[in-house]
A protein has these predicted regions:
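Terminal low-complexity tails and localization/encapsulation signals of metabolic enzymes
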Residues: 1-3, 245-258
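Conserved CoA-thioester-binding segment of acyl-CoA-metabolizing enzymes
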Residues: 1-57, 92
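Glycine- (often His-adjacent) and acidic-residue-rich active-site loop
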Residues: 48, 56-93
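Glycine-rich phosphate-binding loop at the start of an alpha helix
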Residues: 64, 84, 88, 111, ...
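CoA-thioester-processing core
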Residues: 90-96, 104, 110-163, 177, ...
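C-terminal long alpha-helix characteristic of the crotonase
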Residues: 124-129, 180-225, 232-236, 255-258
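Acidic, divalent-metal-coordinating active-site segment for phosphoryl/phosphodiester hydrolysis
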Residues: 166-173
Length: 258
């Protein structure tokens, strides 16, 4: 089963990119990050396209990273940057796509799933959707490239609330703090109306506004390569090893703090 699908009828100005691991609540694998990047690079080239919807299969957007991959793919500060670079490449491909994008959110929108949603231009959420970045429960730190992009969007107070508390928040909280554009009483009806509005607008206008609102918001100071590398160091700590072990053993982690 393909875990990232592009759904588009012939000559349809709308495409849907669907995260398709419903049995795992669309938990994200490294392969899915690669497929997401390629999907958006492919759709970027289609001149007749007017809007892209990103959504999950089976009633959830995405439940975050598939932690079962971490012992093999994110076990050291040497491995982790390669995984991180692929994540960032996919996120930037979504953010910088010239076509307007909408995240249609149901159920869980957590961790990497929330990052994907935040890269979309508009985010419509069903009333029962939930949001969070429970990374502190795994004992690892969000690498700087991801942290910079999200802090730029949400602001430091909201990012710290998400990262330090690790709670799942409801749609009303998400709307107040900018994670959602709006709550949709009827998600499918709101999505249909929104895609119609976007498709009816000028592609030139859309491209201009997407590009220059992004340029205007790029105010965070870039770190040098050594700082970026240091931001991956948490994967070599006892806290990270304990967090991963606790996940697989289905118990509450006891973090030593080093």
């Amino acid at each position: 089963m393909t875990a990232v699908l592009i759904e588009r009828a012939q000559a349809d100005p709308l495409a849907t990119v669907r995260l398709n691991r419903p049995d795992k609540r669309n938990a994200l694998t490294l392969g899915m990050w690669r497929d997401l990047e390629q999907a958006f690079k492919q759709l970027e080239q289609e001149d007749a396209l007017r809007c892209i919807v990103v959504r999950g299969a089976g009633g959830n957007f995405a439940a975050g990273a598939d932690l079962s991959e971490f012992p093999a793919l994110r076990a050291s500060a040497t491995q982790a940057p390669a995984y991180g670079r692929q994540m960032i490449a996919a996120l930037i491909a979504i953010r910088d796509c010239r076509h307007p994008t909408i995240a249609a959110i149901e159920g869980l929108c957590v961790g990497g799933g929330l990052e994907i949603a935040l890269m979309c231009d508009l985010r419509l959420g069903a009333a029962d959707c939930r949001f969070g970045i429970p990374i502190q429960k795994v004992g690892v730190a969000m690498p700087y490239p991801e942290l910079a992009i999200l802090t730029q969007m949400l602001g430091r107070p909201t990012m710290l609330a998400l990262l330090l508390e690790g709670q799942l928040h409801d749609a009303a909280w998400a709307e107040r703090h900018g994670l959602l554009t709006r709550i949709a009483t009827d998600l499918e009806a709101d999505l249909s109306a929104t895609t119609t509005r976007l498709a009816g607008g000028s592609p030139v206008s859309h491209r201009h506004h997407k590009l220059y609102t992004q340029r205007a918001s790029e105010v965070l100071q870039a770190l040098d390569s050594a700082d970026v590398q240091r931001s991956y160091a948490a994967v070599e700590t006892a806290d990270y090893r304990e967090g991963i072990a606790a996940f697989f053993e289905r118990r509450t982690p006891k973090f030593p703090g080093n």
